[in-house]
Amino acid sequence: MKVFSVVGITQSGKTSTVESIIGELKRRRYSVGSVKDIHFEAFAIDTPGSNTYRHRQAGASLVTARGLQETDILYPLRLPMKKILEFYDQDWVVLEGVRDINAPKIVCAHDEEGIEALLDASVMAIAGKVANTGLKEYKGLPVFNPLTQAAALTDYVLAKVPPLLPDFDRQCCGLCGMSCQELLAAIIRGEKEPEDCLLRQNVELHIGGKPVTMVPFVQEVLAKTLTALVSTLEGYEPGKEISLVWQPRKLKE
């Protein structure tokens, strides 16, 4: 899965940029998902007095509204992006307004001051209404008009965005010699490749069908523990793949 975010202030052209890229990706036969981050504090799809609202008021911790055209699962909290992305299996997920993720970003702005306010090492391009000023480049970053340059912008996205990287601190992993955020910035600059991420999952753990990313130390502990348990069993062969599926049962009190 490849993920990137389009960020910017209100009315700077974010949604138009997202629409243009999604449309181009679909025309090129990619599957696409999207996430819209809403910063309006009072925002809620559920409304007081609705049946689903009454379910929640009665004590339901998770409520689902199932209609003929769509199904909405209403979580009563703001989910982290890592959790949200677990629901997606598309080739691409385009985020709008999301900043708290280790992924490349496109900044939309009205002017250069607006660009500068959001500029950091994760930014790979500029787009939105600032393109109407005639600006073609800003500090080495290309500027795209999403309405007239949708194909060129999508070409750039396809060339620049790596598969979603981990998001660990240097102290937690650091196998590549830098933090995950620093590695992303180096990939955007063309100094590193996605393959330079040395966090290889030779031990895979799934909980509830969802993969769990583990740092090398945890992988090693799990591998050594499992190997110690099964190495005494008949049929064990060093170097052969070991698969374990565990369906926990509630213990009797």
Which stretches of residues belong to each language-model region?
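Local cysteine-cluster metal-coordination motifs and their immediate loop/turn environment
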Residues: 169-185, 198-199
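Hydrophobic anchor at the beta1->P-loop junction of P-loop NTPases
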Residues: 6
